């Protein structure tokens, strides 16, 4: 099929590349001419395992192209995907200007029946607004052209997005037109061979499904962080509690890992947007507010532990950080716990030596050259000249470190384990003080 995708960000680029991989002819549109030229040269703007190879392969084959030209891209597409950003507005609600701008462009150039497919994460009711925006432009042109609008939210995990796109566990299609559903079934047939993963519903339910999924996952994380904070105060070990409750099949082990808080481009924004949407309809979503509040508090946890270790005297101290991206297998630092930690350390007069396998360039882009920040090429280099070590992101490369080397290198041997990667007994046996999240005895928190 011929597909046009508006947006070459995370969702648009992954979706376009994966659709091309299945034999479709895809054009990705972006208003950033420099970005389009980089993509044409094979320069991928984000780190995502497996993405570069399928972009290069399909661009070389002619199945995937990039352009800034809107009119020919609209003429190309049997399906027109909207995959642009919906950043939080000043009040936390989703800013719809980019989505509606694309809808208006479609109405200005549409020449025949097509299906407009919204991939962006949007408030409930957006399909109606997109439909109205397209129709208004057609009316202004004094033409009558049929089109359908579908909500088809993405469920891509950063770090596993290509796999998620090629082998989806569900395909949500919100549509009120049988013709549109048939078009989506045809498009997704190669992804849907083993069993029918497509769940068809109305547009509003599909839009809410996306927000509800992310809010549920964020809720599980904040819940476990609450349990971890209780465990610290009662002398329990949250890791044992996690194993105990995870063995209940009604709960399971997914997303019940306590830590330094969640970040990224989705959970913080989507929980806040859903809460604001509820408020705009006269409902106070108190649970969502609590999820947000717990996460804000949890992002300050590592700084709290480090500050307590040094009796609040951080001026002149050097802290080694392992992990800068908000999660492993990405270079994304949006809302990353590492950012709040580094900024708090700097404000307290401390210096940071940091290592991340992929987020070095992004960190430099965000903070530039600073005397109080050294970005290192290897994990052990971050330890040189540091007083203590804080582990912020659970990259696999950090799972089995040489504790003896860490102890010998740090000035005050202590590990602040923001992801509970290590066994406290093993760390302490190696001669290091251990501070985890909710590990009871090792945190030495008094009531």
What do the PLM-derived regions correspond to, one by one?
Residues 1-447:
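Structural/interface elements that position substrates and couple domains in central-metabolism enzymes
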């Amino acid at each position: 099929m011929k597909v046009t995708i508006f947006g070459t960000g995370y969702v648009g680029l992954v979706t376009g590349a994966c659709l091309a991989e299945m034999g479709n002819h895809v054009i990705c549109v972006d208003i950033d001419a420099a970005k389009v030229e980089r993509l044409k040269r094979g320069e991928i703007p984000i780190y995502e395992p497996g993405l570069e190879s399928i972009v290069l392969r399909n661009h070389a084959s002619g199945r995937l192209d990039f352009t800034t030209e809107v009119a020919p891209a609209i003429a190309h597409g049997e399906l027109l995907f909207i995959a642009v950003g919906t950043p939080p507005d000043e009040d936390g609600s989703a800013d719809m200007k980019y989505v509606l701008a694309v809808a208006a462009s479609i109405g200005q150039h549409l020449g025949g029946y097509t299906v407009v497919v919204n991939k962006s994460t949007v408030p409930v009711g957006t399909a109606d607004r997109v439909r109205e925006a397209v129709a208004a432009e057609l009316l202004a042109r004094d033409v009558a052209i049929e089109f359908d609008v579908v909500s088809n939210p993405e469920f891509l995990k950063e770090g596993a997005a290509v796999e998620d796109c090629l082998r989806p566990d569900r395909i949500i299609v919100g549509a009120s037109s049988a013709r549109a559903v048939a078009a989506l079934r045809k498009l997704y047939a190669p992804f849907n061979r083993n069993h029918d993963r497509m769940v068809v519903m109305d547009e509003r339910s599909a839009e809410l499904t996306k927000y509800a999924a992310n809010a549920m996952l964020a809720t599980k994380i904040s819940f476990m962080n609450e349990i971890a904070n209780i465990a610290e105060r009662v002398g329990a070990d949250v890791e044992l509690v996690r194993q105990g409750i995870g063995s209940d099949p009604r709960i399971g082990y997914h997303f019940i890992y306590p830590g330094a808080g969640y970040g990224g481009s989705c959970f913080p924004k989507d929980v806040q947007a859903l809460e604001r949407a509820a408020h705009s309809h006269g409902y106070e979503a108190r649970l969502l507010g609590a999820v947000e509040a717990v996460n804000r508090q949890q992002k300050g946890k590592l700084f709290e532990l480090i500050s307590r270790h040094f009796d609040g005297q951080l001026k002149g101290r050097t802290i080694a950080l392992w992990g800068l991206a908000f999660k492993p297998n990405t270079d994304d630092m949006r809302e990353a716990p590492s950012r709040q930690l580094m900024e708090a350390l700097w404000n307290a007069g401390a210096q940071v030596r940091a290592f991340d396998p992929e987020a070095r360039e992004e960190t430099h882009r965000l903070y530039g050259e600073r005397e109080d920040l050294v970005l290192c090429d290897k994990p052990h280099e971050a330890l040189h000249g540091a007083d203590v070590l804080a582990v912020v992101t659970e990259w696999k490369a950090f799972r089995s470190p040489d504790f003896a080397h860490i102890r010998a290198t740090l000035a005050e041997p202590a590990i602040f384990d923001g992801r509970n990667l290590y066994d406290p007994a093993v760390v302490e046996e190696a001669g290091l003080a251990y501070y985890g999240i909710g590990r009871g005895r090792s945190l030495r928190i008094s009531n």
